[in-house]
């Protein structure tokens, strides 16, 4: 049986980490693509030379021509520029929209049957644009946000409670940004909701609120520490979890930026919600009930996504 093929568009820090993780988890053969010739080839060779030590047989290649992604089963997109100091949101959108247009055309021509995971920011707008530009079915194009945001929340909670991260579940919905919605009512330690743990004296509401806020600002915290870049280990791990659920038909329930067609009262947008990922891509959207506060937070988050989409449509009339 042929190995799966994973195409990574963008061979920067996240792309290289994705390539290494795909090998370690034996998900398939990997092609790294980047417009800067030499970088994907160099990283591919470096990782291939680590394979004898780690004991995996995946084939690695690098390319700067989209024909190399032909027939990919999974495509993970990290191409684009990060937001730099002094750059406005619209500047970032304008640059990365052009990138998504080129990437979308490449996927449409060479890997139209792939499951596509977008990581490029601003995420909720870029995954929406990528689906439009590629013309792929909405269930085969998703954005990586919620898995990462939930992982950050789980890390903070596990540290606070002094328990294993394995026993902490966290629920983060909405857009990937300051308006994300960490739902404490649906987040648990060994099945016990966080709201109950506050009542039991394990933590205080103030500490819980601080962890929620730290989760919202999680990406920025790392940017401020690194000074020359942004997070790449946790984002790569998060995207690999999504790819693995698709390739192995695990049907994991993962929070992702998924296309909504009426669910949660949202139509035609990509918003972070829990979904089942299996061999058919996004197979189901899980709808949870909100209380009034959660509903207001979610609607605010959706409003922010709508603003990003409007900005995209103002920049590129093909998206209008």
Curated annotation (Swiss-Prot):
Its EC number is 1.1.1.37. One of its GO terms (biological process) is tricarboxylic acid cycle. The keyword Hydrolase does not apply. This is Malate dehydrogenase. The active site is at residue 176. GO terms for molecular function: L-lactate dehydrogenase activity; L-malate dehydrogenase (NAD+) activity. SUPFAM superfamilies: LDH C-terminal domain-like, NAD(P)-binding Rossmann-fold domains. NCBIfam families: MalateDH_bact, PRK06223.1. Substrate binds at residues 83, 89, 121, 152. NAD(+) binds at residues 10-15, 34, 96, 119-121. Transmembrane segments: none annotated. The keyword Mitochondrion does not apply. InterPro entries: L-lactate/malate_DH, Lactate/malate_DH_C, Lactate/malate_DH_N, Lactate_DH/Glyco_Ohase_4_C, Malate_DH_type3, NAD(P)-bd_dom_sf. It catalyses: (S)-malate + NAD(+) = oxaloacetate + NADH + H(+). Catalyzes the reversible oxidation of malate to oxaloacetate. It comes from the Bacteria. Gene3D superfamilies: Lactate dehydrogenase/glycoside hydrolase, family 4, C-terminal (3.90.110.10), NAD(P)-binding Rossmann-like Domain (3.40.50.720). It comes from Methylorubrum populi (strain ATCC BAA-705 / NCIMB 13946 / BJ001) (Methylobacterium populi). Keywords: NAD, Oxidoreductase, Tricarboxylic acid cycle. Belongs to the LDH/MDH superfamily. MDH type 3 family. It is an enzyme of class 1 (oxidoreductase). The gene is mdh.
């Amino acid at each position: 049986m042929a190995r799966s093929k994973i195409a990574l568009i963008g061979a920067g820090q996240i792309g290289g980490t994705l390539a290494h993780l795909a090998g370690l988890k034996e998900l398939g053969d990997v092609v790294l693509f980047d417009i800067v010739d030499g970088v994907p080839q160099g990283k591919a060779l470096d990782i291939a030379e680590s394979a004898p030590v780690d004991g995996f047989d995946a084939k690695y290649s690098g390319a700067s021509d989209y024909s190399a992604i032909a027939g990919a089963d999974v495509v993970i997109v990290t191409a684009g520029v990060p937001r730099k100091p002094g750059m406005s949101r619209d500047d970032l959108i304008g640059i990365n929209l052009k990138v998504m247009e080129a990437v979308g055309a490449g996927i449409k021509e060479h890997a139209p049957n792939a499951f596509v995971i977008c990581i490029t920011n601003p995420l909720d707008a870029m995954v929406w644009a990528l689906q439009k530009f590629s013309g792929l079915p909405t269930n085969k194009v998703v954005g990586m946000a919620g898995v990462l945001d939930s992982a950050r929340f789980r890390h903070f909670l596990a540290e606070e409670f002094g328990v294993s991260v394995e026993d902490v579940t966290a629920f983060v919905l909405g857009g990937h940004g300051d308006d994300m919605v960490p739902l404490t009512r649906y987040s648990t330690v060994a099945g016990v909701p966080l709201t109950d743990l506050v009542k039991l004296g394990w933590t205080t509401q103030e500490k819980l609120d601080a962890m929620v806020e730290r989760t919202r600002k999680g990406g920025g915290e790392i940017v401020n520490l690194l000074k020359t870049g942004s997070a790449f280990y946790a984002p790569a791990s998060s995207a690999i979890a999504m790819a693995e659920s698709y390739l192995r038909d695990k049907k994991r329930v993962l929070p992702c930026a998924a296309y909504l067609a009426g669910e949660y009262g949202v139509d035609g947008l990509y918003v972070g919600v829990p979904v089942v990922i299996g061999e058919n891509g996004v197979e189901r959207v899980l709808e949870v009930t909100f209380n009034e506060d959660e509903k207001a937070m979610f609607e605010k988050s959706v409003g922010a996504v709508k603003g990003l989409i409007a900005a995209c449509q103002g920049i590129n009339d093909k998206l209008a």
